[in-house]
Swiss-Prot record:
Side Cytoplasmic, residues: 455-814
Main location: membrane
Protein name, as recorded: G-type lectin S-receptor-like serine/threonine-protein kinase At1g61370
Active site residues per record: D626
Signal sequence residues: 1-25
Residues binding ATP: L507, G508, Q509, G510, G511, F512, G513, P514, V515, K529
Protein's UniProt keywords contain Signal: yes
GO biological process: recognition of pollen
Disulphide bonds in the chain: C286-C298, C292-C306, C376-C397, C380-C386
Family: Belongs to the protein kinase superfamily. Ser/Thr protein kinase family.
Annotated keywords: ATP-binding, Cell membrane, Disulfide bond, EGF-like domain, Glycoprotein, Kinase, Lectin, Membrane, Nucleotide-binding, Phosphoprotein, Receptor, Serine/threonine-protein kinase, Signal, Transferase, Transmembrane, Transmembrane helix
Length: 814
């Protein structure tokens, strides 16, 4: 290479070092930004340049997160008018304005303002804000944060300024490939306290509820468990207000709030592995504004449903029956409205208040400042126009002087709303309650009489035939259980390590009795199950559990460490499970978030592994007979362990099924043939596994899930969902972002196969394992039976049936 070539190469290398990757620090009159060039923030978090949505021919100037794929655009300059050729510049013109021009100097976009300074430059700040700066005073003359598109970043805000007629909102894209303004706008209202709204054109689409210092009352998910935190500053006298948000855990500054073209407001952050949706609204059809019409209550169940508030009836029964609820409801009884101003308003000829819990406060409220809760009620009672009031600790007194619209009830969270009714509504309700209470009292008395008689008969027979009376010494028990190689603990040790069964050591309460935590001398933690005298688990079940668990060892079965029998005390000692039972997670609004879909799928597979061992791989063939979510324990790593073998039965040789005259189990989990004929087999456990599988997917209890006027059960709802959409929409909405649609749909189909009415139509556990771990084609399930309705109680019910006449003879909490 000659000297000239060497000099040229060195010069070129020098220029590349000085001006790398066609990126530079600022836009000036002399240095415009052209297609193919980018402007980066100082630390390289954001980047400004030209882009084409989904590789369309249209070019836009936008800001996005740098070096993150796929590209997330957070601001667009020329969203109304794209550049359609490859010759365009973002520059500062002679009038002192930032403009986008294409061929022949046609102005595509400008900031709409001009400045007289001769030293103007445009920079992209590290917070993602594009600013036009006066180089003389170093003052920001214009900034993109004051002209938002569909996205708000950490240091930007939506706001209103009434005196100056200004409002800063988020405006959705028209569609994912067209950034021009769509039909949705997110804004902050001027009410006191303010609300967040999504408007669809000129009509409300979603409402966040009154602001309560740190949360919107219509978003119960804003419970402090999320990484994002909102803040609203409102100056009522000045007529201004603004909303910003920040990240509580600042291990990442990559976050944005966006309004999608479908009308969904999402707060998204990057946890280092990818983008995660922290909060989203709306998430349910109940969230859509005024779904149930005036004085209608939208129940945020799955799926949502509408009801009239107490004391109200549908305006049109015909429309209501068609599920067209927008007409709402009307009062059944007019208010007396004697302008009462004291507590005597509760008298029969006055008006009263009915309290509705867990609701989003209605729209169109009035804030009454500086009064307490009692005065709030009296102010409403003394005003004939007042239809309801709510006293919210972080707000104060809110009253409503018109129809109640956009009222929603949550499963948990929300506020308390007191609705004004005619006193006759309460009187009628009280009469019904008295009648019901009388019937229940008489029924309970009769049941107790018969139960006492049969219990006396049962105890008399037990005294004649029981091979080991409760009073028998521990030595006799040792002799009886000697072949099982069971460890015996003495009672004094148990009393010491449980601090005399103190409340501090109590882990929980089951139908069998309490469970306590203890620490052995070597520091090992154990769980002690203490059989209570009122438990439905008798001597037979106690012995059964010891004999079975002592012979069964598997990573997905709870391990028995020993027992203690002294006098009437019977105790079982197990390995300690740090996370208690599965039901404490999936049915808890906060804890359920710790079990995303991948973890739930692992738990499902673990339970199936445990059942496979019981049915096929152990030295015994065991039918559990009481598979349910509360009998699945979780260790410190959330590995599932099947527990409670008191009702389990062993099968011998070629035996595949058995019959019992004493049907025991938990309502909702019992297969049809077992509940009504006493016939049980491995397929009985498969049925219960199917129910359990659907509970894990949905996060809903079989014992409390009913929807619609016809009272559909969880199983029926799962069947309808599978028929309509393949079942992928069944996943618990609180963790839906973590789920694989195909995986969820597959598990729903497996669950439906497991709950088939005929035992022969259900797969065995080996087939279930293959279905869960392979991509084999699944058979189509038949419509399951939905005959058995289950009512929720404080504890799950273990039910015993006499199969002679299929009548319930005893119910024992379990």
């Amino acid at each position: 290479m000659g000297k000239i070539g060497i000099v040229f190469f060195a010069s070129l290398l020098f220029l590349l070092i000085i001006f790398p990757s066609c990126a530079f620090a600022a836009i000036t009159r002399a240095s415009p930004l052209s297609i193919g060039q980018t402007l980066s923030s100082p630390n390289g978090t954001y980047e400004l340049g030209f882009f084409s949505p989904n590789n369309s021919r249209n070019q836009y100037v936008g800001i996005w997160f740098k070096n993150i794929t796929p590209r997330v655009v957070v601001w667009v300059a020329n969203r109304d008018k794209p550049v359609t050729n490859n010759a365009a510049n973002l520059t500062i013109n002679s009038n002192g304005s930032l403009i986008l021009v294409e061929r022949e100097q046609n102005v595509v976009w400008s900031i709409g303002e001009t400045f007289s300074s001769n030293e103007l430059r445009a920079e992209l700040l590290e917070n993602g804000n594009l600013v036009l700066i006066d180089g003389v005073s170093e003052r920001n003359l214009w900034e993109s944060f004051e002209h938002l598109g569909d996205t708000m970043l950490l240091e930007s805000s939506v706001m209103y300024d009434v005196p100056n007629n200004k409002k800063r909102v988020l405006s959705s894209w028209k569609n994912p490939t067209d950034p021009s303004p769509g039909e949705f706008v997110a804004e902050l209202t001027t009410q006191v306290p303010p609300q967040g709204f999504i408007m669809r054109g000129s009509r409300p689409y979603w409402r966040g509820g009154p602001w309560a210092r740190v949360r919107f009352t219509g978003i119960p998910e804003m419970d402090g468990s999320h990484v994002s935190k909102f803040d609203i500053s409102q100056d009522v006298a000045a007529g201004t207000g603004s909303l910003t948000y920040s990240l509580e855990r600042r291990n990442s500054n990559l976050s944005y709030t966006t309004l999608t073209s479908a009308g969904s407001l999402k707060i998204i952050w990057n946890n280092g592995s990818g983008w995660v949706t922290d909060l989203e609204a709306p998430v349910s059809s109940c969230d859509v504004y005024n779904t149930c019409g005036p004085f209608g209550l939208c129940i945020r169940s799955n799926p949502p449903k509408c009801e009239c508030l107490k004391g109200f009836v549908p305006k049109s029964d015909e429309e209501w029956n068609k599920r067209n609820w927008t007409g709402g409801c009307m009062r059944r009884t007019n208010l007396s409205c004697d302008v009462n101003s004291s507590a005597t308003a509760q008298a029969n000829n006055g008006d009263i208040f009915d309290i509705v819990a867990n609701v989003k406060p209605p729209d169109f409220y009035e804030y009454l400042s500086l009064i307490n809760e009692e005065d709030c009620q009296q102010r409403c009672l003394g005003n004939c126009s007042c239809t309801a009031f709510s006293y919210i600790e972080q707000i104060g007194c809110l009253v409503w002087n018109r129809e109640l619209v956009d009222v929603m009830q949550f499963v948990a969270g929300g506020e308390t709303l007191s609705i004004r009714l005619a006193s006759s509504e309460l009187a009628g309700s009280n009469r019904v309650k008295i009648i019901v209470a009388s019937i229940v009292s008489i029924s309970v008395f009769m049941i107790l009489v018969f139960a006492s008689y049969w219990y006396w008969r049962y105890k008399a027979k037990q005294n004649d035939s029981n091979p080991i009376p409760l009073e028998t010494s521990q030595d006799a028990w040792r002799e009886q259980l000697k072949p099982q190689d069971v460890n015996f603990f003495d009672m004094q040790t148990i009393l010491t390590i449980t601090n005399n069964f103190s409340m501090e050591n109590k882990l929980g309460q089951g139908g069998f009795g309490p469970v306590y935590k203890g620490n052995l001398q070597d520091g090992k933690e154990i769980a002690i199950k203490r059989l209570s005298s009122t438990s439905g688990q008798g001597l037979e079940e106690f012995m059964n559990e010891i004999i079975l668990i002592s012979k069964l060892q598997h990573r997905n079965l709870v391990r028995l460490l020993g027992c203690c029998i002294e006098g009437e005390e019977k105790l079982l000692i197990y390995e300690f499970m740090a996370n208690k039972s599965l039901n404490t997670f999936i049915f808890d609004s906060t804890k359920k978030l710790e079990l995303d879909w991948p973890k739930r799928f692992e738990i499902i597979q673990g339970i199936a592994c445990g059942l496979l061992y019981l049915h096929r791989d152990s030295c015994l063939r065991v039918v559990h007979r009481d598979m349910k979510v509360s009998n699945i324990l979780l260790d410190e790593e959330m590995n599932p362990k099947i527990s409670d073998f008191g009702l389990a039965r062993m099968f011998q040789g070629t035996q595949h099924q058995a019959n019992t005259r004493r049907v025991v189990g938990t309502l909702g989990y019992m297969s049809p043939e077992y509940a009504w004929t006493g016939m049980f087999s491995e397929k009985s456990d498969i049925y219960a596994f199917g129910v359990l599988l659907l509970e894990i997917i949905t996060g809903k209890r079989i014992s409390s899930f009913t929807i619609g006027e016809e009272g559909k059960t969880l199983l029926e709802f799962a069947w309808d969902s599978w028929c309509e959409s393949g079942g992928s929409d069944l996943l618990d909405q609180d963790i839906s972002s973590s789920g694989s649609e195909s995986e969820v749909a597959r598990c729903v189909q497996i669950g439906l196969l497991c709950i088939q009415q005929q035992a022969g139509d259900r797969p065995n556990i080996a087939q279930v394992m293959s279905m869960l771990t392979t991509t084999m084609d699944l058979p189509k399930p038949k419509q399951p039976v939905f005959a058995m309705q289950v009512q929720e109680s404080d504890s799950e019910s273990k039910t015993m049936y006499s199969v002679n006449n299929i009548t319930q003879t005893a119910i024992v909490g379990r």
